[in-house]
Amino acid sequence: PFPLTSTDTTEYKINENLFDISATYKNFYLYTQLEYSDPPIFGETRTTIDKILNSYYLEYLNEKLNLKLGDIYSVYTRGLMFNTYQDQSTDFNNSISGVELSYLANDWLRIYSLYGTDTYEFRTRPDNQLSDLSFNHTSAFLGTEIHPISDIILNIQYLNQSLNISESVTNEGGVNTIGYYANLFTILGNDIAENISDFSTDNINSYQINADMLGLSLQGYLFGLDFYGEYASNKYT
């Protein structure tokens, strides 16, 4: 990790090892990523059996059906509605653990869906070795990919996210997740900031925030030109 008392780069030492292991059998595909790190660039040390499994999923694929169980890393359309990925260099991982399904109903219609839950961990400072804040979340996503005519694709999507924010999760400075979001210039942050006194004086330790998103995208190729447009609306309750 970063040296705490010196800026000498020779003191910056890491021992991070990643092992991608996969296997296939007929229509099944198994993927696992193991990590042995002592210490890693960012994140916690992983040297014991209960911590070295970094991610995994089992996938089944045929001509019409694609089913995946485990850690879900996916992007739909341009990612405005749903986008999960892993960036090892910054210890970022917003995947969910659950199930993902895609079904090709016919030549012009594909239906896809996923459901999962996980704990999202993040840092209040980019140079923190460990994540210091977190919240639990559950996502339910449903979409359709429609091909009305050749070279035109229409996507209609719905996403429900449920966030569980606990005041007991605080960083070293004593700021909890509610306080952190109140300082962000977002719709959710502004709403929390306007009601921060109510959050501070009530006897509730955990807050449930629901987000309902509707998305519409259109892409295609006409008259020698590629075009793409996407719209998403979000409502917090």
Segment roles from a protein language model:
Residues 73-80, 84:
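Surface-exposed extracellular loop regions of Gram-negative outer-membrane beta-barrel proteins
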